[in-house]
Regions:
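Amphipathic alpha-helical segments of tetratricopeptide repeats
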Residues: 31-38, 92-93, 100, 165, ...
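Eukaryotic intrinsically disordered, low-complexity segments enriched for acidic and Ser/Thr/Pro residues
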Residues: 1-41, 265-268
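Amphipathic alpha-helical repeat scaffolds of TPR domains
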Residues: 13, 45-72, 86-147, 151-210
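Short amphipathic alpha-helical heptad-repeat segments
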Residues: 19-26, 52-58, 194-201, 218-225
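Alpha-helical linker/edge segments of TPR/alpha-solenoid repeat scaffolds
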Residues: 117-123, 143, 250-269
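Alpha-helical positions within canonical tetratricopeptide repeat
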Residues: 76, 83, 155, 221, ...
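Extended alpha-helical scaffolding segments
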Residues: 203-247
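Inward-facing hydrophobic residues that define packing positions of alpha-helical scaffold repeats
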Residues: 30, 81, 88, 95, ...
Length: 269
């Protein structure tokens, strides 16, 4: 790699100064919101939605500073990428606190939590989840294909998928799929995204099990994400699709059971 010129380094440091000030301002706003929540928990769900948005904005500046490092200095800034990655988790955690982290449980398991943000409409939900997805993708792209965090992102993306799914109102989802219903296009896009992400999470957890960890908990999570996908199929009255997913779950469960038996036999020998 060619030596970075002093002019390029100076330009980089000057450019990111404004971004660092903005980062400080966002962090101070978050502290103020958290202080308010400590004194009064009223409307805490909406405040956490605000905190998720603030941290997505914060994350974007770390991504931007890394991109500037690449373009001006010719090198990735792992420190900024790591901060962005941590913020991805922070945003997901805020959202899990709002709509729960229930993967394959029934709507009744988290219905009460989602009801608390009823005025957070379908348009705002769509904007937030697409912004979250873009943020995760930008961080992944920043690290590159050969990152040591490859398998860690399987969990992050799966937790994001759960949040996307849990922001759907499964009680009204079938009616929402009527082309004449208000917000049909956005709600359909939301459902399509949730289904794609859940299937992707199932496949990636199985891949993680087979190619990396050999941890049975990863295989169990793969099956749970298929279960979540099945719940969505049932919610929109797609019985045949739900049955096909159930068959796939049974096949995967049988493989898991067989692997567990083989492991048990091997340990006893």
């Amino acid at each position: 790699m060619s030596k970075v010129s002093e002019d390029a380094r100076k330009k980089y440091l000057e450019t990111i100064q404004d971004y660092k000030k903005t980062i400080e301002d966002i962090e101070n706003r978050e502290k103020l919101i958290l202080q308010v929540m400590e004194k009064d928990a009223t409307g805490s769900e909406y405040k956490k939605l605000r905190l998720a948005e603030e941290n997505l904005n914060l994350l974007s500046y770390y991504v931007l500073m890394n991109n500037l490092s690449v373009s001006l200095l010719g090198v990735k800034n792992e420190g900024y990428l790591n901060e962005a990655r941590k913020l991805c988790y922070k945003v997901v955690i805020y959202m899990e606190q709002v709509v729960s982290n229930v993967i394959d449980g029934p709507w009744s398991d988290y219905e009460d939590k989602v009801a608390l943000i009823s005025s957070f409409d379908y348009q705002d939900r769509w904007k937030l989840i697409t912004k979250m997805g873009l943020a995760i993708q930008l961080v992944l792209t920043g690290y590159g294909d050969n990152t040591k965090w490859k398998w860690a992102f399987v969990e992050l993306e799966a937790r994001y998928a759960t949040v996307v799914k849990n922001l759907l109102n499964l009680k009204t989802l079938f009616q929402d799929m009527d082309p004449n219903a208000e917000g049909y296009d956005i709600k359909t896009a939301h459902l399509t995204l949730a289904r794609r992400l859940l299937e992707q999470s199932a496949n990636k957890y199985r891949e993680k099990f087979e190619l990396s960890t050999l941890r049975f908990d990863d295989f169990r999570l793969a099956i749970k994400y298929l279960g979540a996908l099945r719940y969505l199929a049932l919610a929109v009255n797609k019985a045949t699709e739900a049955e096909n997913i159930k068959k796939k779950m049974d096949i995967w469960q049988q493989k898991l059971d067989n692997d567990l038996k083989r492991k048990d036999i091997a340990e006893k020998q």
